[in-house]
A protein has these predicted regions:
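Alpha-helical scaffold segments of alpha-solenoid architecture
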Residues: 220, 245-255, 261-262, 268-293, ...
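N-terminal adaptor-interaction module of cullin-RING ubiquitin ligase components
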Residues: 1-123, 128-148, 153-173, 177-184, ...
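Short linear motifs in intrinsically disordered/low-complexity regions
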Residues: 8-11, 49-61, 70, 75, ...
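Leucine-rich repeat
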Residues: 9-11, 39, 60-87, 89-97, 102-121, 128-136, 139-146, ...
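Leucine-rich solenoid repeat modules
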Residues: 295-300, 305, 310-431
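Concave beta-strand-loop units of leucine-rich repeat
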Residues: 99-105, 123-130, 148-155, 173-180, ...
Length: 431
């Protein structure tokens, strides 16, 4: 049977340029056809947001229908997957971001050294990758700026090798496996990259020992497991916090932890460089909260964004924060315990008397009571320094009268926006 030459095939495929379904079917004829069709299909990437939804669904549907077809056996499915990855690795020379979520041995494919050499941001799902893949990648994937690790387990020698090989690793995010324990070796290898890493996100307190990174500027710690205050994990993490020193730290974001004494020590050791502090915790032991708030007031003169919880015992310390932290742009004060409903007016009075002129965003708890007179007096004081946003989380004690007063000041241009906010600030009403 006579085969069409390349020129003829190119003419035919170009005529079919708008018929994506036919072009996708041509991918499966043979390798020669596949090599000619791919450049045409990839002239516009499927992730280009200018594509309309109908076109995106068509493209995605065609390329995945072979994998979902019951008649398409597993061995053929794996073979097709492998050929697609081979083509991808060999032909794409300037990929900067990569999400590695496959058991295919990509590091062994032709062109892998060039492909991975140029990758700057890599996201890997550990339990989906062959053990030797990361070892092989460590030979040529050495210029990552950002590494995101999913399903991190107790120990993975390939991951250790990959991190050890990096020349300029700056950002690391670690998400744990549900059964993972502490991986000391991972902590050690990150410590060896302390001169370059400036952004660390830990989505569990039980993944690695918290190491001191000399150039760390951003630190995020999420206790999603919500370990009990007396658990071994919390006690161990308290020690890590107390012994850690991040003198260049600028952003501290902590969720689900109430280690206030240790956090106070950490803040003291930042040498007054903190610009953003967010400590979110609810229904927990508030021991040492006063020490923590005092540490902010005494050691954070440059802080611009502040989000913390308080109780009726500590609200008086707000004055010292407002007096000492004169660069504040955004403040969020939340109620840790619901018995604090009486302190709303006192907080507003402190804000009236001591707010820095730089303040333009304010979010307060709706679990506190605000008298109409003080609420109005506070908004009147905003004529001296305009608020871009005034928000109330929840609205337990916010009445229609409060809303009407706020609307009046929005209409007069004293504040740009008033919002009732809900958990995570993802759902809100506008005025």
């Amino acid at each position: 049977m006579t085969e069409l030459n390349i020129d003829c095939l190119n003419l035919i495929f170009n005529e079919l340029r708008k018929d994506k379904e036919t072009l996708y079917s041509c991918l499966l004829v043979n390798k020669r056809w596949c090599l000619l069709v791919v450049p045409i299909l990839w002239e516009k990437h499927t992730w280009n947001f200018y594509h309309d939804e109908a076109e995106k669904k068509t493209i995605d549907g065609i390329i995945t229908k072979f994998f979902k077809d019951k008649k398409f056996k597993d061995d053929k499915r794996k073979l097709l997957e492998q050929e697609i990855y081979k083509l991808f690795v060999n032909e794409c020379k300037n990929i900067k971001e990569m999400d590695l979520y496959t058991s295919q041995p990509l590091s062994l494919f032709q062109g892998a050294s060039t492909f991975f050499y140029n990758v700057k941001k890599l996201s890997i799902t550990i339990n989906c990758i062959l053990p030797n893949t990361l070892h092989e990648m460590a030979k040529f994937c050495i210029y990552l700026n950002e590494l995101i690790i999913h399903n991190c387990s107790q120990y993975n020698s390939g991951l250790i090798s990959l991190i050890d090989s990096q020349k300029n690793l700056k950002i690391v995010s670690i998400y744990p496996d549900s059964k993972a324990g502490t991986c000391k070796e991972l902590g050690k290898v990150l410590g060896r990259k302390g001169n370059t890493i400036n952004d660390l996100s830990l989505y569990s307190i039980n993944i690695i020992p918290l190491i001191s990174l000399v150039n760390l500027k951003n630190l995020l710690i999420y206790n999603f497991e919500l370990y009990d205050i007396n658990s071994i994990e919390i006690k161990r993490f308290r020690q890590y916090l107390e012994n850690s020193k991040f003198s260049n730290l600028q952003i501290l974001d902590v969720y689900g932890l109430s280690c206030f004494k240790e956090l106070a020590t950490l803040i003291k050791n930042t040498e007054e460089n903190l610009l953003e502090i967010s400590i979110i915790t609810k229904y927990v032991n508030t021991n040492n909260l006063e020490i923590f708030i005092n540490s902010i007031a005494n050691n954070c003169p440059k802080v611009r964004d502040l989000s913390i919880g308080i109780t009726s015992k500590e609200f008086i310390l707000i004055k010292s924060i407002l007096l000492n932290c004169r660069n504040l742009i955004c403040i969020e004060f939340d109620s840790i315990c619901y018995e604090n409903d009486i302190i709303g007016d006192e907080i507003l009075n402190y804000l009236i008397d001591y707010s820095p002129k730089s303040l333009n965003k304010l979010i307060l708890s709706g679990n506190w009571k605000y008298s109409i007179d003080i609420f109005k007096r506070f908004l009147e004081s905003c004529r001296n320094h305009k608020l871009i946003l005034f928000g109330i989380t929840y609205e337990i004690f916010i009445t229609d009268d409060h809303v009407e007063i706020a609307r009046k000041y929005v209409n007069e241009g004293v504040i740009d926006e008033f919002k009732i906010l809900y958990p995570s600030h993802t759902s809100h009403s506008y005025i």
